[in-house]
Amino acid sequence: MANGSEVIIMKLIKAIIKPERFEIVKKALEEKGVTSMTTTEVQGRGEQKGITLEYRGKQMIVDMLPKIQIEIIVRDREVDELIATIIGAARTGRIGDGKIFVLPVDAAIRVRTGEMER
């Protein structure tokens, strides 16, 4: 609780985007005041289902494509604005632009101090 009585509702925004859009998305989030985030290199597929590449004259199907996963913990009231920011920076209009998930967060605990936000 903040201020003794206010309950802070937190959410986890998990965005999976094309790697080449990461720096653009990061900059857009920083401009909105987001400085803390976790990123992970992941592989995935959705509607895109993969691509066909040619290597040494042979065709190869790559069905799991590289993506970047961004995780941000935010207050509930910030979710809509940050989703719009991510979409605006990540969207190319082509299949494979990514996906955004929003999940509830029960608590955040700072390891160094043990301080807990609920």
Say what each PLM segment does:
Residues 2-118:
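Positively charged, small/polar-rich N-terminal and surface patches that mediate targeting and assembly
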